[in-house]
């Protein structure tokens, strides 16, 4: 039994594609699943950072700052930003001879 559903055969007019059993429910289901898989894969590659960040952290944006004085909020923001900033002093330059 062959897994191929399409066979190309030479004719006088050129190459034709004859689909065998294209009305088979299994072929239709496989085609729909294949198309959905392709669409989901494309969306995943386009929005993977947003999707996985949403799955990891949910809808919360971070710790609540309700009831915290403004000076402490600013200090917290600066700490978070300094943790993200890259320090060039940690890189080592290696020169090859």
Curated annotation (Swiss-Prot):
Pfam families: Flu_M2
Keyword rRNA processing: no
Essential for channel activity, possibly by being protonated during channel activation, and by forming the channel gate and the selective filter (site feature) positions: 37
Compartment(s): Virion membrane; Host apical cell membrane
Lipid-substituted positions (S-palmitoyl cysteine): 50
UniProt GO cellular component terms: host cell plasma membrane; membrane; virion membrane
Classification via Gene3D superfamilies: 6.10.250.1640
Any GO BP: protein complex oligomerization
Alphabetical UniProt keywords: Disulfide bond, Host cell membrane, Host membrane, Host-virus interaction, Hydrogen ion transport, Inhibition of host autophagy by virus, Ion channel, Ion transport, Lipoprotein, Membrane, Palmitate, Phosphoprotein, Signal-anchor, Transmembrane, Transmembrane helix, Transport, Viral ion channel, Virion
Site (Seems to be involved in pH gating): 41
Modified residues (Phosphoserine): 64, 82
InterPro entries, A to Z: Flu_M2
Region Disordered, residue ranges: 60-83
Membrane-spanning parts: 23-43
Entry's family note: Belongs to the influenza viruses matrix protein M2 family.
Subunit comment: Homotetramer; composed of two disulfide-linked dimers held together by non-covalent interactions. May interact with matrix protein 1.
Protein name per the record: Matrix protein 2
Organism of derivation: Influenza A virus (strain A/Swine/Hong Kong/127/1982 H3N2)
